[in-house]
From Swiss-Prot:
Pfam families, sorted: PRISE
Entry EC number(s): 1.3.1.122
GO molecular function: oxidoreductase activity, acting on the CH-CH group of donors
Source organism: Nepeta cataria
Active site: 180
Protein name per its UniProtKB record: (S)-8-oxocitronellyl enol synthase ISY2
Presence of the UniProt keyword NADP in the record: yes
CDD domains (UniProt xref): 5beta-POR_like_SDR_a
Disulfide bridges in this chain: none
Catalytic activity: (S)-8-oxocitronellyl enol + NADP(+) = (6E)-8-oxogeranial + NADPH + H(+); (S)-8-oxocitronellyl enol + NAD(+) = (6E)-8-oxogeranial + NADH + H(+)
Binding site for NADP(+): 36-38, 64-65, 82-83, 106-107, 144, 180, 207, 214-216
Protein purpose: Iridoid synthase that catalyzes the first step in generation of the iridoid ring scaffold using the linear monoterpene (6E)-8-oxogeranial as substrate. Iridoids comprise a large family of distinctive bicyclic monoterpenes that possess a wide range of pharmacological activities, including anticancer, anti-inflammatory, antifungal and antibacterial activities. Catalyzes the conversion of the linear monoterpene (6E)-8-oxogeranial to (S)-8-oxocitronellyl enol, a precursor of nepetalactones, which are metabolites that are both insect-repellent and have euphoric effect in cats.
Entry keywords, A to Z: NAD, NADP, Oxidoreductase
Length: 397
């Protein structure tokens, strides 16, 4: 996808001349926390480019695991660091004293929302407690949360429910535990420690992007499902509810979110604000399902379940590890295990619920005019997964 988004008007450049001069005089240095995630990987690819605003950026990328092969071609300084470990953060991050912008795009999952709040709050606080005092030129912190900001947890759903759509940034918080609220509160408190330090919060919906490591990689998960159906000669049936099949959905392209980050980090009109992020169009899964089937040469099924019946990929795919191992061997794919690339819980969460659409008006009003065609976006990330040999290149002959 084209990265000329700023110059070509995907974001309306409204910096005054003095801001532009300051940007040219000082190199932008990024710390991407969660660099192997969907958005982190896009940032790592985009920031070092010479035509990226503020670019080429110097980039540090932090992730818990050793650097994967599919991330090695990005010209960044990779640091393996578990940000939930306070001692490890305090040992590895202080030398990064030239950082000017932090892009925080990672999270962890626990068995309850109370534990999610504690674990994710600690991770963010570890990073900010270490970086803010040690980075004299730190200017801005971008925090990625998500659309679940507007939705109660499963446990609290019957009591607190969700806001009516379209979801807008000025809606009040729900009376429920939500680790996104915890993270925002920590961010707003931490930035007070340094005069002039600004922040932005980014709330994407379902992300279409590339990361075999992501816990929320919907495109990759559906590609793995399609490849297994192809291998077994099965029909590609839609594992979701009728509302998702027939109703309108939206998504957020990982590259678009990265552009949104960079815009907010550099444009004064975006400082100290929370923003939704989505492609700006809508689609129906019954249309994208045909695209997925064509890409893997498999017979396209549809919504074929009796009322009240639920078929979930967590159940259907639980014994398919040996099938995936065979697909990997026969197609010369990257050596992955099914549990690494198939995030069935997440696809079940998305496809067994009707999409709750958001509004991008606030971003537009503040100067960000970026958008994506969601069908083209879906195809783009499928092709990238094939190119990096994460999934087979099967198509209809």
């Amino acid at each position: 996808m084209s990265m000329n988004w700023w110059r070509d008007g995907a974001a309306k450049k409204r910096m005054d001349e003095s801001s532009a001069v300051k940007l040219q005089q000082q190199q932008c240095v990024a710390l991407i926390v969660g660099v192997t995630g969907l958005v982190g990987n896009s940032l790592a690819e985009m920031l070092p480019l010479s035509d990226t605003p503020g670019g080429p950026w110097k980039v540090y990328g932090v992730a818990r695991r050793p650097r994967p092969s599919w991330n090695e071609d990005h010209p960044i300084n990779y640091i393996s660091c578990d940000v939930s470990n306070t001692a490890e953060v305090e040992a590895k991050l202080p030398p990064l004293s030239d950082v000017t912008h932090i892009f925080y795009a990672t999270w962890t999952s626990r068995s309850s929302e109370e534990e999610n709040c504690e674990a994710n709050g600690k991770m963010l606080k570890n990073v900010l407690d270490t970086m803010i005092p040690n980075c004299p030129n730190l200017k801005h912190i971008c925090l990625q949360t998500g659309r679940f900001h507007y939705v109660a947890s499963v446990v609290d759903w019957k009591i607190n429910g969700s806001h009516d759509t379209p979801l807008t940034e000025d809606l009040p918080r729900l009376n429920t535990n939500n680790f996104y609220y915890t993270q925002e509160d920590i961010l707003l408190e931490e930035v007070k420690r340094k005069e002039g330090l600004t922040w932005s919060v980014h709330r994407p919906g379902t992300i279409f992007g590339f990361s075999p490591y992501s816990m929320m990689n919907l495109v990759g998960t559906l590609c793995v499902y399609a490849a297994i159906c192809k291998q077994e000669g099965a029909v590609l049936r839609f594992p979701g509810c009728k509302g998702a099949w027939d109703g309108y959905s939206d998504c957020a392209d990982a590259d678009l979110i990265a552009e949104h980050y960079i815009w907010a980090a550099l444009d004064p009109h975006a400082k100290n604000q929370s923003f939704n992020v989505s492609n700006g169009d809508v689609f129906k899964w019954k249309h994208l399902w045909k695209v997925l089937a064509e890409q893997f040469g498999v017979e396209c099924g549809g919504y074929e379940y009796e009322e009240g019946q639920q078929v979930r990929l967590q159940d259907v795919m639980k014994d398919k590890g040996p099938v995936w191992d065979k697909i990997v061997r026969e197609n010369g794919l990257s050596n992955t295990k099914l549990e690494d690339v198939g995030k069935w819980w997440f696809s079940d969460t998305i496809l067994w619920n009707e999409c709750r659409l958001d509004s991008m008006n606030k971003s537009k009003e503040h100067g960000f005019l970026g958008f994506r065609n969601s069908k083209n976006c879906f195809l783009y990330w499928i092709h990238k997964l094939k190119a990096y040999k994460i999934v087979p290149s099967s198509t209809i002959s």
